Amino acid sequence: MCDEDVAALVVDNGSGMCKAGFAGDDAPRAVFPSIVGRPRHQGVMVGMGQKDSYVGDEAQSKRGILTLKYPIEHGIVTNWDDMEKIWHHTFYNELRVAPEEHPVLLTEAPLNPKANREKMTQIMFETFNTPAMYVAIQAVLSLYASGRTTGIVMDSGDGVTHTVPIYEGYALPHAIMRLDLAGRDLTDYLMKILTERGYSFTTTAEREIVRDIKEKLCYVALDFEQEMQTASTSSSLEKSYELPDGQVITIGNERFRCPEATFQPSFLGMEAAGIHETTYNSIMKCDVDIRKDLYANTVLSGGSTMFPGIADRMQKEITALAPPTMKIKIIAPPERKYSVWIGGSILASLSTFQQMWISKQEYDESGPSIVHRKCF
């Protein structure tokens, strides 16, 4: 890129939300749900200008007449036609830019299949005619955003949770762990345990309400059994929440029972290990000489790590698993909900990064497989 004054675009496509904006900014300009909706019925009114598909917030607000689909499942793109619609919406409606004028930095899940990165590359160059692009691993960007190049990132979003050890800027694929338990599952679980209290939440509209309850009132207990004890003997942990129709509901031990599932997936009927064990197992898969650096640089990232109390609990749990004298530090940056995007913004604006872009010319010469040679 000889043209230094053109800002690169940074697009972080998550299972739940898409974050997009310009490199060099400190926060994404656009954050919208990663959903594509199609009308359930043929329009009755002629000339209503009904579109064949809606994306993001517009799809969310018209969900009564649409069938909603999430093109990204568990962090990995499964529907390319819909994904293309999301990117189109990102460039033209949210950021209002011409993608053929800006380099684009995209993010991918750890252990993303090779064919997927090639497909992303192909769509960017052939459909959107970008002058240059790059694909970066989400967890690596979160680590950059925290000002580190070595550490282990526990990234938990809406669709998937990963623990990714990174040494000197490179992810160590053999030690990456994936846990299919994240924000969406926690919302489902909260819906379930609120139903036990006698409140009924079933529809997609109600699911959004429960997600809001989760984000506003849930927290992680330092000692779960102790907290359950406290909740059963006093009402000090109870909070009330006003529903959109004005009805007020009370929520007690559900506040910490919901996020506890990330430490005890058995609550959801899953046999997987909790996030603390997963992080520990990831570290143990790494070379013995770098473990010390990973324990001392454990970085939390993603929306599902936003629960109050999560860092203290991680500290406690990992200390119990690790060797007795090991220094353990859990880093939970306040902006961790967007740290993947922020890391991308930092990376794409570094002068040393400018020769890393895959240019249109390189793509034309080598085809989509160029992505494996230039992005790792």
From Swiss-Prot:
Sites of the modification N-acetylcysteine?
C2
Q: What is its main location?
A: cytoplasm
Query: Where is this protein localized, as stated in its record?
Result: Cytoplasm, Cytoskeleton
Where would one find coiled-coil regions in this protein?
A: none
Q: Which domain of life is it from?
A: Eukaryota
Q: Which residues carry this modification: Methionine (R)-sulfoxide?
A: M45, M48
Q: Known InterPro entries for this protein?
A: Actin, Actin/actin-like_CS, Actin_CS, ATPase_NBD
Q: Which GO terms describe its cellular component?
A: cytoplasm; cytoskeleton
Protein family (similarity comment): Belongs to the actin family.
Its protein name is Actin, cytoplasmic
What taxonomic classification does the UniProt entry list for its organism?
Answer: Eukaryota, Metazoa, Spiralia, Lophotrochozoa, Mollusca
